[in-house]
Amino acid sequence: MIVVEHVTKKFERFKNKREKEEFFADNDISFQANDGEIIGILGPNGAGKTTLLRMIAGILEPTEGSITFDGMNYQNQEIEIKEKIAYLSGNTKLYDTLTCYELLKMCCDIYNVDKEQEDRRIEEVAKVLKMESFLYNKIANLSTGQTQKVNIARCLVHDPKYYILDEATTGLDIISSQIILDFIKQERKKKKTILYSTHYMEEAENICDRVIMINKGKVIKSGTPEEIKESTKTTNLRDAFFALIGGNLDED
């Protein structure tokens, strides 16, 4: 279980050539993600989704608030938490000179996967993500979809407890996207805790148990997809989101 309580992140930016001002990337965000749940973090580009997930993944420190993982926090149990996290960002760069297998082997070493289990784990992940045909190819020679599968595979070799997935299917074709979504659903059955950020509302509606809608760093609505559609008198999450913001997507 992941519990986010009153989390805020402030940055400074230039107001003009001489003056700076503070702005809120995320402002007083709270929610709980239970075991065996897929929680969608929804919103347009610039809404604060990535900043929020980077704080949950321990990459950024919140200005205010707390984040706990089954009672553990980064202040006292950072190593224990990070050993159980899978963090996927669409901006992650891979080592192009390595083969997929070599990269996954390296990730096994980083996460202290039992040496006798490394090849078994790599084979399992490759099979689930349908990577067998290019497992021994260099990453530099892969397609966009294949590269994203490797990016996901590197997060999985240590069998994480908590998934923090930021735009996992962006830029992928329909088949590759579906393989990844099917995998996420399978991990839910194993009682993993999954946070899934996307701006694809239809995708979230299909796989998420609950969603948290964010705009301009603030939570504007949370609940199951059905609850949100019912409360906004709409038939899909996209229309619900626009109803909640009054159709205004202007970014600060």
Regions found by a protein language model. Give the residues of each.
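Conserved ABC transporter NBD signature motif
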Residues: 65-75, 80-81
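ABC ATPase "signature
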Residues: 222-223
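Conserved structural motif at the start of ABC-family nucleotide-binding domains
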Residues: 2, 24-26, 82
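Conserved ABC ATPase signature
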Residues: 97, 138-142
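Catalytic Walker B motif of ABC-type/P-loop ATPase nucleotide-binding domains
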Residues: 163-167
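Conserved ABC ATPase "signature" region
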Residues: 105, 109, 116-134
